[in-house]
């Protein structure tokens, strides 16, 4: 009886999308006031402290240092938090929130390829066609000049690959590990990695008064948008196949993100961006309405 778990997985996926819709706009707000590396380090440190508190209350700290789990937990922390968030915040600081939103839509392509190569989920012709539509939409929305001149665009395009690689590690090495442990490890270890990188980078921080004023927003960014979103995501992929979960979450985020970008930043998408986003959303809709991925036989 898979109906009930799938319905619950869909609910977690939608909640993850709503949460994620605010990520680009808030990232643009914070990186506009402080260095991107500092924002990444402090927001993830806040998430790490929250994760430590949650795991302590649940008496689940032991798995973080268990010999059979710790290497894989460190790996997903390096990929899915430290590297991904470094690329994301650096990219967001160099582009608009709308461009950041558009770039992240490439994630289903990575999910499709990794699910096929590593998990044996063969792509159907329908999903291949959807991938072509999705990529065409992103290219149309961004335009050729963005790929040629913007380092931020390339950093943002690389970010979802880091996330998908970390998800793959979870599915291959950490099956059965509670979502709260996975999320806690990602932000504890990943936050520590980013703090260490910031400490040795010599990056200047804003004046103490300004930094203090930013801390509440950084805390929300790390704990709610970061840790909360990760918890929701792991609950979703525990009940849905990776490509399907990605294809549900990713199309909802840009539509809601455009509203968040307008509300928080006053950014308005151009007609070209709307057209590209529409094509991308249609491509992902083809993903969502298609059959679940097939697993190759041994």
Where are these regions (language model features)?
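Glycine-/small-residue-enriched transmembrane alpha-helix faces in small-molecule transporters
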Residues: 1-41, 145-172, 192, 196, ...
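Residue-level signature of transmembrane alpha-helical cores of multipass secondary-active transporters
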Residues: 10-13, 17, 73-77, 89, ...
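Cytoplasmic-side transmembrane-helix entry/capping segments in multi-pass membrane proteins
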Residues: 10-14, 67-76, 123-134, 153-156, ...
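Helix-helix packing/entry segments at the starts of transmembrane helices
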Residues: 15-18, 40-42, 85, 99-106, ...
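Specific transmembrane alpha-helical segments of multi-pass solute transporters/efflux pumps
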Residues: 19-26, 58-98, 104, 138-140, ...
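Membrane-interface helix termini and inter-helical loops of multi-pass transporters
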Residues: 25-36, 61-64, 93, 139-151, ...
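Transmembrane alpha-helices of multi-pass small-molecule transport proteins
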Residues: 33-83, 110-111, 162-166, 183-204, ...
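Hydrophobic transmembrane alpha-helices of multi-pass small-molecule transport proteins
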Residues: 51, 114, 123-143, 194, ...
């Amino acid at each position: 009886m898979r109906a009930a778990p799938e319905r619950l997985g869909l609910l977690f996926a939608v909640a993850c999308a709503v949460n994620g819709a605010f990520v680009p706009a808030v990232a643009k707000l914070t990186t506009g006031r402080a260095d991107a590396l500092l924002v990444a380090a402090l927001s993830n440190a806040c998430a790490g402290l929250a994760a430590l508190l949650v795991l302590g209350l649940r008496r689940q700290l032991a798995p973080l240092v268990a010999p059979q789990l710790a290497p894989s937990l460190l790996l997903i922390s390096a990929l899915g938090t430290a590297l991904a968030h470094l690329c994301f915040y650096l990219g967001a600081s160099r582009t608009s929130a709308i461009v950041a939103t558009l770039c992240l839509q490439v994630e289903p392509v990575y999910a499709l390829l990794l699910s096929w190569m590593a998990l044996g989920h063969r792509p159907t012709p329908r999903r291949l066609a959807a991938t072509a539509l999705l990529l065409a939409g992103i290219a149309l929305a961004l335009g050729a000049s963005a790929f040629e001149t913007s380092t931020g665009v390339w950093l943002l395009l690389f970010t979802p690959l880091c996330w998908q690689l970390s998800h793959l590690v979870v599915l291959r090495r950490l099956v059965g590990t509670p979502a709260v442990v996975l999320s806690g490890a990602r932000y504890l270890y990943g936050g520590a990695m980013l703090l260490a990188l910031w400490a040795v980078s010599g990056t200047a921080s804003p004046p103490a008064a300004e930094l203090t004023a930013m801390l509440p927003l950084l805390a929300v960014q790390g704990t709610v948008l970061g840790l909360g979103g990760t918890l929701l995501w792991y609950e979703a992929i525990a009940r849905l196949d990776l490509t399907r979960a990605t294809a549900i979450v990713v199309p909802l985020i840009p539509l809601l993100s455009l509203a968040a970008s307008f509300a928080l930043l006053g950014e308005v998408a151009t007609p070209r961006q709307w057209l590209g986003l529409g094509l991308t959303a249609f491509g992902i809709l083809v993903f969502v309405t298609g059959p679940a991925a097939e697993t190759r036989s041994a």
